[in-house]
Amino acid sequence: MSIGLLLLTIGLPTLVGAILIVPAWLVPRIREISGLAGSALGVALGMALVVAFMCEAGVPSLPPEQKWHMLPIIACGIVILCPVVAIMDGSGELGRWLISIASGAIIGWLAVFPQMDLLGRILLGVWVGVSFMVLSWVSHRRRGITVTLSLTIVFTAMSLLCFESHFITLTLINGALAATAGVGFASALIAEVWTRDEEGKRRSIAIGWGGAFAAASLVPLACFCGWAYTIGDVMWIHWGLVGAAPVMLLFGELPGFHQRHGLVSSFLRVGLVCIPVAVALVLVFTGIDSDDESDGSETHIEMMYSGR
């Protein structure tokens, strides 16, 4: 993997994400536009996946040449729908349930990866729906820095799992998603530290339903795609632990913990997300047998070029 390809595939999507996130979260006049701040992160994540894929694998075709090429196509749909979902933010529990059910059903129907039967697609759809319910609820209660830092950690971990699975394109895509989420974290942190509202209080940025919708869709999608093409030491339990990590933010709302505020409490909640991530990475990197790496790589390449 050349440095130039690495910079292009991760750097360009990150730049696109910065162009979308920074003005929407840091420029007051732009931030006040309805639905813009709440969709910026979601649109940026979707665009990051599409741009990273195109930099490494070219423009996806319709119908896709390989099953996993549905990822950028689904991401395009996420980009289009994020502003709509963001405008629905605050519509109440009915709106939340409708988005959860619809997003889970559509993604479970469209994403057909190798080794995925009907039960697997149902599980993916349920995972997407539950993730949206959790992240959309948490996004109303917690700072943007909490969720964006959590997503940065999760996408970074998924990139490492893909690297160990010899899935280079998805490694770069997850790296681009991690970098874009990192831009969101930096922007949310800057907004909170350096900006004030009319009463002189620190202004917190929320990722909104648009950001929650994109994150709840892309994390399970990337996990299932990585699992479907995994041969070797990276197993379903590792993908499951990392993919379920954002849901750990829900435990930060338990009685006795939910009343804690401030930057320290935000990082404590991020620590909850780190627990399953750390367990998964420790299990992977302590169980890797270098003698099996070549066999896994060859099988993976055969799967890719067979159009699966």
List the predicted regions and their residue ranges.
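N-terminal topogenic module of multi-pass integral membrane proteins
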Residues: 1-141, 252-268, 272-308
